[in-house]
UniProtKB/Swiss-Prot annotation:
Main localisation: nucleus
UniProt-listed GO biological process terms: intracellular protein transport; tRNA re-export from nucleus
Subcellular localization: Nucleus; Cytoplasm
Name of the featured protein: Exportin-T
Organism classification: Eukaryota, Metazoa, Chordata, Craniata, Vertebrata
Length: 962
């Protein structure tokens, strides 16, 4: 072997050596017999370096995985012998191999097993067992091989072909017949031999039993001698976690409901008498997390048994199953309330399913009612934050607690289904007592009290948030709690979690303020002062900006008395912060978007006359326009690229803010009705010069383009005079992405204004197409994926543009471009339909073609178009689906084929018998289609029902493709 190259396998080797080692590995993979050198090195223990041994196994792994069928019988025998002799050597080695080498060796054994077991090596396990016997090193490798085989056969994370899946099923069936009882016996012997002397091997063996129990005969494991041994392991500290997992797999195995019930009950009796049902908070939490998972599995298994027995009408056994479930509830509650969230989380499934049973019962016993209440109290307690929770840097622990809270929320929702009155009463009790003394209560208790009120909104669902009408007792309870929330002063609590929960809840129950509007001023003040938008925490300010926007929007009819006051108070929050002013703004630009939108909503929905609305909107937008002009001048002069970028960002924010205010308008309150057209036209005139700025083009164009999209909706035809010059600037020096983003703007204008923009479209049609073609024809690196994707997206945008033009009744825009240009456009559509393997673009192209045939395909169509139909469009309808890349199993491609069928139907509709004659006598014979199939095709085409032809066309091409 190349010793120099092998040096590069060391993790500390420099990059040149590592590159050489990689190249050597590739070379050995390709070489037909280099693997033999590696096999020999392993069998004869030529190398002591761990990385070289691992490397040799990798080469063998590649050989077995990808090239095994190419080997001769002798070579295949050599690989078997190499592995067995390596295994034998492990019995004698003074030191065991490193874990990563043992795992890799096990993977190679497993690959060889799945390749040879059914054909050449049926005695695989017997051969291995005869080598390893009960030698601890041998047993370790045997167990690793079993786990690797399980991964190959059963692991759902490994994607298998249908062929491999069939093979794996056959292997498992054969193993069940031939060797599983022997394997199970070997596991029993290993467990018995090593349970007190070698915990590592025992735990490995328990893992193997747990893995295999899912697909072998359960009676081999679920019997007295095996179960008693596993239960014995539950009392041995180093084994009990693995024993728990193994028992969980046994309990999880599907079986007859009565047998499952008996199995679970027998396990529980032993565990209970051994004291496992009394949970000690100080107990080892890792073990309790596994134990909780086991109890969850047992509980859910009993519930599945109960469901099956009820379904089968076996009431007697169902009653027994329910009794068995009830006796586990006390244990479930101990685990649910445990201070460690992992332990609690692992039992939630059982708890949830138990509540589902109670929901189905017509009457609950006193004990069941007590259980519901106990679960409710446990959920309320567990929703509470820990004292040491880090709110400033939540990290992974924070994410896990958020996830855990979501699980608890599901329990709360289920509790509401079982006993809504009890839930409401419990929450009300906790909420009221906590808020009476909030000044002296710890933050986590105050937060959870408000949180529970918040969660009731989803737990007790109503349509359109109408919590304060309908059921009187529920409405008055919620109303009381909301009144307490907004009048208690708790919004001043000095903790971010309480502050945020206050605002979230106020917005969640916004309908309360239509019932008791007298509380609006104090809540508005909370939003606007140091409790909300001016809070010391950026996180609170940011979230409040969004919630304030929602609050104002949902209560806009109640806002009229406060509008001017609010606008004055948020004045400083609306300031555009230029990069050079140095001071940190209270809100980020993203947060400011919500404040601008809120200001817009207040103005537009006010009861003021149009003149007042216009004046207020001008006050809001004029500072933006003034700042914009100054910043644009500064950008033109800026030399430093970093400064250019920050100025461009600021300009972009200004445009974005103006754009966001326009979201307040609606069909009822249009820009015109509010008298605000002039203000937005001024904005347009202010922002458009940014398009001619040669610096930071991407960001400036993107902002102005978005603003134009909004103005087309808001200002309608008043925006049209600005479009030609804006388009001209946006077509200068553009890249694929610029064009791709510009085309939707033109599509929007075309679809909205149609004939009104015909002169403009005629004028800019070819310049736009030239810009597109120029970018598409630019050479790119062969393997530049992003460039290829950009071109694909641009091509799609181009075809979408043509589709918009043709479907908006503007085909004369194309027709008036001169014969040569028209032909060029049509040819690109044919290319799009046939040549590019992009079903989305192909579908669009066929839509364009069928539309053009519909418009121009009759007797009075443009000169030469009928020829084009027969020379190009008809062939496209056959050549595209016949391509290998046209995958009829793909949903998008089927849609493209559907439009192809529409195109052919439209040609037949416009050209009549002439079309059928052309297909029968010229085109289809030229494709060597059999006469009877031609006949069949033409009959299908002439069917009045288009769906019949679409279905036929799919079958036609499925038959035609090899």
């Amino acid at each position: 072997m190349d010793e120099q190259a092998l040096l590069g396998l060391n993790p500390n080797a420099d990059s040149d050596f590592r590159q050489r080692a990689l190249a050597y590995f590739e070379q050995l993979k390709i070489s037909p017999d280099a693997w033999q050198v590696c096999a020999e090195a392993l069998a004869q223990r030529t190398y002591s370096d761990d990385h070289v041994k691992f490397f040799c196994f990798q080469v063998l792994e590649h050989q077995v995985k990808y090239k095994y069928s190419e080997l001769t019988t002798v070579q295949q025998q050599l690989i078997r012998e190499t592995l067995i002799s390596w295994l034998q050597a492990q019995m004698l080695n003074p030191q065991p191999e490193k874990t990563f080498i043992r795992n890799k060796a096990a993977q190679v054994f497993a690959l060889l097993f799945v390749t040879e077991y059914l054909t050449k090596w049926p005695k695989f396990f017997f051969d291995i067992l005869s080598v390893v016997d009960l030698n601890p090193r041998g047993v370790d490798l045997y167990l690793r091989i079993l786990m690797a085989i399980d991964s190959e056969l059963v692991d759902r994370d490994v994607v298998h072909t249908s062929e491999e899946a069939r093979r794996n099923t056959l292997i498992k069936d054969t193993m069940r017949e031939q060797c599983i009882p022997n394997l199970v016996e070997s596991w029993y012997q290993i467990l018995q031999n090593y349970q007190y002397t070698n915990s590592e091997v025992t735990c490995q063996c328990l893992e193997v039993v747990g893995a295999y129990v899912s697909w072998i005969d359960l009676s081999l494991i679920a019997n007295d001698r095996f179960i008693n041994m596993l239960l014995g392991h539950m009392s041995i500290e180093v084994l009990r976690e693995e024993a728990c997992d193994c028992l969980f797999e046994v309990v999880n195995k599907g079986m007859d409901p009565v047998d499952k019930m008996k199995l679970v009950e027998s396990l529980c009796q032993v565990l209970q008498s051994a004291g496992f049902f009394s949970i000690d908070q100080e107990e080892d939490v890792d073990f309790l997390a596994r134990f909780s998972k086991l109890v969850n599995g047992m509980g859910q298994s009993l519930i599945v048994s109960w469901s099956k027995l009820i379904k089968n009408g076996d009431i007697k056994n169902a009653q027994e199953a329910l009794q068995a479930i009830e006796t586990k509830v006390a244990l479930m509650l101990q685990l649910l309330i445990h201070e460690d969230d992992d332990i609690s989380s692992n039992i939630i499934g059982f708890c949830y399913d138990y509540l589902h049973i109670l929901k189905q019962l017509t009457v609950l016993s006193d004990q069941q009612k007590a259980n519901v209440e106990a679960i409710m109290l446990a959920v309320m307690k567990k929703l509470t934050y820990d004292e040491e929770y880090n709110f400033e840097n939540e990290g992974e622990d924070g994410a896990m607690f958020v996830e855990y809270r979501k699980q608890l929320k599901l329990l709360l929702d289920r509790l509401a289904q079982v006993s809504p009155e009890l839930l409401l009463a419990s929450v009300r009790r906790v909420f009221t007592s906590t808020l009476q003394n909030w000044q002296t209560t710890r933050f986590m208790e105050v937060e959870v009290a408000i949180r529970l009120l918040y969660m009731l909104a989803e737990a007790l669902p109503v349509s359109h948030g109408a919590h304060f009408s309908g059921d009187v007792s529920k409405a008055s309870a919620l109303q009381d709690m909301m009144r307490t929330l907004v009048t208690s002063g708790v919004s001043s609590y000095q903790h971010t979690s309480v502050t945020l929960e206050f605002f979230e809840t106020v917005v969640r129950y916004e309908k309360f303020f239509t019932v008791e509007p007298q509380h609006i001023p104090c809540v508005l003040m909370a939003f606007l002062d140091h409790r909300g938008l001016r809070h010391s925490s950026a996180k609170v300010r940011s979230r409040t900006a969004y919630l304030f926007s929602r609050f104002v929007k949902s209560l806009n009819k109640q806002m009229n008395p406060f509008i001017e006051d609010i606008l004055n108070r948020i004045q400083d929050l609306l300031e555009l912060s230029p990069p050079e002013n140095g001071h940190q703004s209270l809100l980020s630009s993203d947060d400011q978007l919500f404040i601008y939108e809120t200001a817009g909503v207040l103005i537009v929905n006010s009861e003021y006359p149009a003149e007042r609305k216009q004046a207020l909107m001008r006050n809001l937008l004029t500072p933006l326009m003034e700042k914009f002009k100054i910043l644009l001048e500064k950008l033109m002069l800026a030399q430093d690229e970093e400064r250019q970028a920050s100025l461009a960002d600021c300009l972009n924010h200004a445009v974005g803010f103006a754009s966001r205010t326009s979201k307040a308008f609606s069909n009822k309150q249009t820009v015109k009705q509010c008298g605000c057209s002039e203000v937005y036209l001024d904005c347009l005139q202010t922002f458009l010069p940014a398009l001619s700025c040669p610096l930071q083009k991407d960001i400036l164009r993107s902002g102005v383009r978005t603003f134009l999209h909004r103005m087309i909706i808001c200002l309608e035809e008043e925006v049209l005079p600005f479009i030609p010059s804006a388009s001209e600037h946006m077509l200068k020096d553009c890249e694929a992405k610029d064009l791709q983003e510009f085309i939707p703007l033109i599509n929007q204008i075309t679809a909205k204004f149609k004939i009104q923009v015909s002169p403009f479209l005629q004028q800019m049609f070819m310049p736009l197409l030239h810009a597109i073609f120029e970018v598409l024809l630019r050479p790119a690196e062969e393997n530049d994926q992003s460039a290829a994707l950009e071109k694909q997206m641009l091509r799609r945008s181009y075809f979408a543009f043509l589709q918009t033009v043709t479907s908006s009744g503007m085909s004369e825009v194309i027709a008036n471009q001169g014969a040569e240009n028209v032909e060029r456009v049509l040819v690109t559509v044919i290319q799009g339909a046939v040549e590019y393997p992009d079903p989305i673009a192909q579908k669009t192209c066929f839509i364009i073609l069928s539309k053009l045939v519909e418009l121009w395909g009759g007797k009075d169509g443009p000169v030469g178009f009928a020829d084009f139909v027969y020379k190009h469009i008809v062939p496209a309808c056959f050549l595209a689906p016949l391509k290998q890349t046209f995958d009829l199993a793909d949903a998008q491609t089927v849609l493209a084929l559907s439009e192809c069928a529409v195109t052919l139907k439209t040609i037949h509709l416009k050209r009549g018998p002439e079309c059928v004659q052309y297909l029968q006598q010229e085109y289809l014979p030229s494709l060597q289609v059999a006469p009877e199939i031609i006949q069949e095709f033409c009959q299908a085409l002439q069917q009045p029902d288009a769906k019949v032809f679409k279905n036929y066309l799919k079958v036609f091409f499925q038959r035609a493709k090899p």
